Amino acid sequence: MKIAIAGASGRMGRMLIEAVLNDADAQLVGALDRAGSPFLGQDAGAFLGKDTGVKLTDDLDAVFAQAEYLIDFTRPEGTMAHIEAALRHDVKLVIGTTGFTAEQKADLQAAAARIGIVFAANMSVGVNVTLKLLEFAAQHFSHGYDIEIIEAHHRHKVDAPSGTALMMGEAVAGALGRSLDDCAVYGRHGVTGERDPSSIGFAAVRGGDIVGDHTVLFAGIGERIEITHKSSSRVSYAQGALRAVRFLSARGAGLFDMQDVLGLR
């Protein structure tokens, strides 16, 4: 599997590079970084003390010409440029970027008519199994329970609520036969009035180096149920991304997510 990594100098990018280098079936063939990055020209394995022969570059076409797959955990504007390059070079994509606009999501979906794409806000096995647990719980706590989603991430995260929190909201809303767009409440301030019993609330915390904590609260009278997932390391995301690459190796064009990769549909 000839794999390139986008955002190669970032925290997630470095974790992905290490995972690829440690996988006997994978070959690191490219490492992309943003234009103007001080890391351009450095070896992709320098942070590990390894010489990979792969230099960080901002030349999209040079990297895509060598790759079969690109793993992309960057930002929406960068990912959209990577999608265009992937279409030019027939490269399959594993995308963990969050914060897309509706228009960008539509463009991503259109690209999947030509190339294979796994797109998931969270690629850990634990989170995706948690989504199934939430669907089950929501069906049994559909009456008399208020639903709130609380998430916490590091101080550098730029979007809120997190993509994973929104995935959890979609899972719960879908199990209840609702549209998340119609029932989501994002933060509260001032005199809000009584809670709408059909709403799903979101609260976001930002601070320190929190990798990612998510709790879905089902609050009833006399009891409350909390389903929580906590990430202590990004390694679970990297391993999930490689699992997604293996999944794509046996697939043609199409848009998939980690529920497909893990056989949870």
Curated annotation (Swiss-Prot):
Q: Which residues does the record give as NADP(+) binding sites?
A: R34
Give the signal peptide, or none: none
What processes in GO biological process is this protein linked to?
diaminopimelate biosynthetic process; lysine biosynthetic process via diaminopimelate
Q: Which stretches are transmembrane?
A: none
**Keywords (A to Z) from UniProt:** Amino-acid biosynthesis, Cytoplasm, Diaminopimelate biosynthesis, Lysine biosynthesis, NAD, NADP, Oxidoreductase
For this chain, one GO molecular function annotation is:
NADP binding
Which residues hold NAD(+)? G7, A8, S9, G10, R11, M12, D33, G96, T97, T98, A120, A121, N122, M123
Active site, per annotation: H153, K157
Role this protein plays: Catalyzes the conversion of 4-hydroxy-tetrahydrodipicolinate (HTPA) to tetrahydrodipicolinate.
Enzyme Commission number, as recorded = 1.17.1.8
Spell out the HAMAP family in the cross-references: DapB
Q: Which residues form a coiled coil?
A: none
Keyword Oxidoreductase attached: yes
Q: What class of enzyme is it?
A: oxidoreductase
The reaction(s) this protein catalyses: (S)-2,3,4,5-tetrahydrodipicolinate + NAD(+) + H2O = (2S,4S)-4-hydroxy-2,3,4,5-tetrahydrodipicolinate + NADH + H(+); (S)-2,3,4,5-tetrahydrodipicolinate + NADP(+) + H2O = (2S,4S)-4-hydroxy-2,3,4,5-tetrahydrodipicolinate + NADPH + H(+)
Functional pathway: Amino-acid biosynthesis; L-lysine biosynthesis via DAP pathway; (S)-tetrahydrodipicolinate from L-aspartate: step 4/4
Family per similarity comment: Belongs to the DapB family.
Location of the protein in the cell: Cytoplasm
Q: Where does (S)-2,3,4,5-tetrahydrodipicolinate bind?
A: H154, G163, T164
Protein name (record)? 4-hydroxy-tetrahydrodipicolinate reductase
GO annotations of cellular component type: cytosol
Q: Where would you say this protein principally sits, based on its record?
A: cytoplasm
